[in-house]
Amino acid sequence: FDVADMDGDTAKELLVLNKTTENAAASAAMYRQEGGVVNLVGKLDLRTGFSEFSQVLYGKRPGETDGIFIDGISGTATLQTEVLCVKDGTLAYVLADADTVSKTARSAGYLSMDLMGNGEIVIPVQEPFPGYAADASEQVRMTRFLGVSGSALKEVGRGYFSLNDGCIFLLPLSWYGSVTAVTDTLTGDIKFCRYDGEIHD
């Protein structure tokens, strides 16, 4: 559970998360204290099948109440993010549908974050850098940082994100599609190089 001001009225609400069980879908419920009594004011099934939760973050949405970003594990080791908000006093979905939510799927460990320090949360998803087949065993993976725009996901940046080293390198826009990355076979370091349909390392 978590306690925070979820609707921007300065009073704090209680968010309770329940993971998927044999008899019930994963869900989020919001409670508010009114007149000395704690009341349930909203509950939604999460469109992810979360078997466990990783974190909850709150992110700015211009002109709207904050988004509630819920990271959790679906299946064996797939991390996904459901985004909720408070609308008309109750919980509401931010992302349009389950298909949009599924686009947040990535490897465990790549948690949502405030990448730029501006209060806006982004979701890091991975794909191979240009020049690698999707099933290549030695591919270097690029991270696409997805922000929320209305009820859709919008790419706000690309980069190389190493969980092991704890570092993120953001790619300049001019590199998109023309630069890829390779692993130095001697040092294990990541190197960036020109890509024009072939990898020039």
Predicted regions and their residues:
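Beta-propeller fold detector
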Residues: 39-46, 93-99, 154-159
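Conserved blade-ending motifs and adjacent loop-strand segments that build the rim/top face
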Residues: 93-113
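N-terminal "mature-domain start" segment
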Residues: 157-179
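Structural motif
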Residues: 22-31, 75-87, 129-149
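Beta-propeller blade termini
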Residues: 1-6, 52-62, 107-117, 124
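Secretory pathway targeting signatures of secreted, lumenal, and periplasmic proteins
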Residues: 172-201
